[in-house]
């Protein structure tokens, strides 16, 4: 897993999953690319405001690389990580707060953010374990890629430049042409795209379910 931890990436993941849930029969599959299964969300303790972009939002994550089962168990035992978070925008941008959507149905928590971070940088979501979300949306390159088009498995070139994934919580429309109406709708595509990650939804669900670190997080956060 690529080393990194960033609130904006994690917020992107902690949003997504209504469309995924509707598309997959197996409940855990909703988390193949993103980190929220709304129907099975665990009870959260309400009430903490966090500044969008503040590094404190990801403070205390169990690690920035591969995480052990004992580490994640300790993390999941901390009820603070299940406190419901309300993101607010920095001074001067507060008028944009009305554009933050989806959190009423899908409360944001540090536990979801951390799971999303792990998935974002994990190439095992692709069929040959070579391409992660961060491969085409790299934080060190402004959450995009310095190539003409996105590059997927086996070096295949996509049809368009990779759009910036930074702070996507502020927009419902996704992709350059806006064809996806939400992050939830967008998130189910890349894994099964033969050029991008080349996997199947069923295959990635089975793979994630076989990994104890992921299985424990899904069970504790979503009950499945």
Language model regions located:
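Periplasmic c-type cytochrome electron-transfer domains
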Residues: 2, 12, 23, 40-224
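Bacterial N-terminal signal peptides that target proteins for export
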Residues: 5-31
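Bacterial N-terminal signal peptides
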Residues: 28-40
């Amino acid at each position: 897993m690529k080393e990194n931890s960033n609130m904006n990436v994690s917020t992107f993941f902690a949003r997504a999953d209504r469309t995924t849930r509707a598309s997959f029969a197996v409940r855990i599959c909703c988390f193949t690319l993103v980190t929220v299964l709304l129907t099975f969300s665990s009870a959260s303790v309400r009430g903490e405001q966090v500044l969008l972009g503040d590094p404190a939002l990801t403070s205390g994550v169990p690690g920035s690389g591969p995480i052990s089962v004992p580490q994640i168990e300790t993390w999941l035992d901390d009820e603070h990580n299940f406190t419901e978070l309300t993101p607010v925008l920095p001074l001067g941008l507060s008028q944009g707060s009305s554009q933050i959507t989806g959190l009423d149905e899908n409360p944001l928590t540090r536990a979801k953010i951390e799971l999303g971070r792990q998935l974002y940088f994990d190439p095992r979501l692709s069929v040959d374990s070579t391409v992660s979300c961060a491969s085409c949306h790299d934080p060190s390159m402004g959450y995009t890629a310095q190539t003409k088009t996105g590059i997927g498995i086996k070096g295949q070139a996509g049809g368009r430049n990779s759009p910036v994934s930074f702070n996507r919580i502020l927009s419902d429309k996704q992709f350059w042409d806006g064809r996806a109406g939400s992050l939830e709708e967008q998130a189910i595509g890349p894994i099964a795209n033969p050029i991008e990650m080349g996997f199947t939804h069923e295959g990635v669900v089975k793979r994630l379910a076989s990994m104890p670190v992921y299985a424990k997080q899904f069970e504790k956060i979503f009950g499945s």
